[in-house]
Swiss-Prot record:
Residues 85-89, 138-141, 195-223, 313-315 are lumenal. It comes from Arabidopsis thaliana (Mouse-ear cress). Its EC number is 2.3.1.-. Glycerophosphocholine acyltransferase (GPCAT) that utilizes acyl-CoA to acylate glycero-3-phosphocholine (GPC), forming lysophosphatidylcholine (LPC). Shows broad acyl specificities with a preference for 16:0-CoA, polyunsaturated acyl-CoA, and the hydroxylated ricinoleoyl-CoA. Also catalyzes the acylation of glycero-3-phosphoethanolamine (GPE) with acyl-CoA. In addition to acyl-CoA, GPCAT efficiently utilizes LPC and lysophosphatidylethanolamine (LPE) as acyl donors in the acylation of GPC. It is found in: Membrane. It is a multi-pass membrane protein. It comes from the Eukaryota. It is an enzyme of class 2 (transferase). Keywords: Acyltransferase, Lipid biosynthesis, Lipid metabolism, Membrane, Phospholipid biosynthesis, Phospholipid metabolism, Transferase, Transmembrane, Transmembrane helix. The chain crosses the membrane at residues 64-84, 90-110, 117-137, 142-162, 174-194, 224-244, 292-312, 316-336. Belongs to the GPC1 family. This is Glycerophosphocholine acyltransferase 1. The gene is GPC1. GO terms for biological process: phospholipid biosynthetic process.
C-alpha cells in the first residue's frame, strides 16, 4: 500500500515537473514573441522614419537637378542664339553634334520607359535624312530642297499644332523642341545667311542666280519642294505601318504599357473627347487608325505646300522663324504657369496619401512606447 502511495506521489511529482517545464517553455515562447514583436516594431519605426527622410532628400535632389537643368538649358539656348548671329555657317555642325549625342541618349531613355517606338515617328526619319544631307551631300541641290520641305513643313508646324513646349527645366521637352526647331533654323541659315550660299546665289556683277540653289523654275520648285518630299513621306508611312501595325502588332497587344504615337494621341483624344476623337470615329472604332493616317497625310500635304512661298521669300521665312520660336516659348510658359502647378498639387496629394499611413504608424508606435502619465502602467503580480 505504501509502495502504491509512493508511486502515486512520484507520478504526481513528475507530472508537475513536466507541467512546470511546459509552463516555462510557454513563458519563454511568449517572452521571445514579445521581444521579436518589439524588435519588429522598432525596425518598422526605423524604416518608416528612413522612408520619410529619403522622400524628403529625393525631393530636395529633384529640385536641385531641375535648377541645374534650367541653368544649363538657358545658357545653352543663349549660346546657340549668339552663334546663330555670329557664325551662321557653323549652325549645321552644331545641329549634327546635337543629333549624334542626344538622339542615342533619348533612345536609351525611351527604351527604359517603353517609349522607344516614338523614334519611328516621321520627325526622326526626317532628321536622319537631314544628317545624311549635311554630312555626305552638302552641295546636293535637290536633296537640300527635300530637306527644306520637311524641316519647314511638317516638323515646323508640329511645334504649333502639337504644342511643343520650350521648358528649360525638362531635358525631354528641350530635346523634343530642338528636334522640330533646329532643322528649320539650319536650312534657313544655309538658304539665306551662309556666306558661301550668298556667293553662289548672287555672283558679283550679275543679277541671275547661276548656281546652287537654282530656284527660278517654278515647276522645278514644285517638284522638289512638294512632289518628291510627298513620295518620301509616303514611303515612311508605309514602312511605319508595316513595322508597328503588322510586324510588331502582337508585341504591342501583349504589353499595353508600350507607347506609340497613335496610342498616345488616341488616349489623350478619348480622355478629352475632342474633335479629333469624334472625327476619327466616323468610320467606327476599328478604323480609327486609318482616320489618323488620313489626318496626318492631310496635315503633311498642307504644310509642305506652304514651304514653296517660304522658300522664295526671305521676309516670309524670317517671320516664320519668329512664329515658331514664339510658339515654343508661349507653350513653355503655358506649361510652367498652368500645367506644372496642377502637377505639383497632384504630386503633393499623392505623396501625402502615401506617407500618411507611415506617419500614423510612427505616431501610434511612439504613443505605445511612451505612455502618458495619466495612463495606467502595467504592474507585475
Amino acid at each position: 500500500m505504501a509502495n502504491n502511495e509512493d508511486s502515486n506521489s512520484n507520478g504526481l511529482d513528475s507530472f508537475d515537473a513536466v507541467k512546470q517545464r511546459f509552463k516555462d517553455r510557454s513563458k519563454k515562447v511568449v517572452q521571445t514573441r514579445e521581444l521579436l514583436s518589439k524588435q519588429a516594431v522598432q525596425t518598422r519605426e526605423i524604416l518608416s522614419k528612413q522612408a520619410v527622410k529619403i522622400a524628403k532628400q529625393a525631393e530636395e535632389h529633384e529640385r536641385f537637378i531641375n535648377k541645374v537643368t534650367h541653368l544649363v538649358g538657358v545658357l545653352g539656348f543663349g549660346g546657340f542664339c549668339f552663334l546663330l548671329g555670329a557664325r551662321p555657317q557653323d549652325i549645321p555642325l552644331v545641329y549634327c553634334f546635337f543629333y549624334v549625342i542626344f538622339v542615342p541618349l533619348r533612345w536609351i531613355y525611351y527604351r527604359f520607359k517603353k517609349w522607344h517606338y516614338y523614334l519611328l515617328d516621321f520627325c526622326y526619319y526626317a532628321n536622319t535624312i537631314f544628317l545624311v544631307d549635311l554630312l555626305l551631300y552638302p552641295k546636293n541641290e535637290k536633296l537640300f530642297m527635300v530637306c527644306f520641305s520637311f524641316a519647314e513643313g511638317p516638323l515646323a508646324w508640329a511645334i504649333i499644332v502639337w504644342r511643343c513646349s520650350l521648358v528649360f527645366s525638362s531635358p525631354d521637352k528641350i530635346v523634343s523642341v530642338l528636334i522640330h526647331l533646329l532643322p528649320g533654323l539650319v536650312f534657313f541659315t544655309i538658304r539665306w545667311w551662309n556666306p558661301a550660299t550668298f556667293a553662289a546665289m548672287h555672283p558679283v556683277g550679275t543679277d541671275r542666280r547661276v548656281s546652287w540653289p537654282y530656284v527660278e523654275d517654278k515647276a522645278y520648285l514644285f517638284t522638289w519642294l512638294f512632289l518628291v518630299p510627298l513620295v518620301v513621306y509616303t514611303l515612311w508611312q508605309v514602312l511605319y505601318f508595316l513595322i508597328v501595325n503588322v510586324l510588331r502588332r502582337q508585341r504591342l497587344l501583349r504589353d499595353p504599357e508600350v507607347m506609340t504615337s497613335y496610342r498616345e494621341l488616341s488616349k489623350k483624344a478619348e480622355k478629352a473627347n475632342n474633335k479629333l476623337w469624334q472625327l476619327s470615329g466616323l468610320l467606327g472604332d476599328q478604323n480609327r487608325i486609318w482616320m489618323y493616317i488620313l489626318f496626318q497625310a492631310i496635315f503633311t500635304v498642307a504644310t509642305m505646300a506652304l514651304t514653296v512661298p517660304i522658300f522664295l521669300s526671305y521676309r516670309l521665312h524670317v517671320i516664320f522663324q519668329i512664329l515658331k520660336i514664339s510658339a515654343a516659348v508661349w507653350n513653355g510658359g503655358s506649361f510652367l504657369l498652368e500645367v506644372m502647378p496642377r502637377q505639383v498639387i497632384q504630386k503633393e496629394k499623392k505623396k501625402k496619401a502615401e506617407m500618411q499611413p507611415i506617419e500614423e504608424q510612427i505616431l501610434h508606435h511612439e504613443a505605445v512606447s511612451h505612455p502618458t502619465e495619466n495612463e495606467p502602467k502595467s504592474t507585475e503580480t
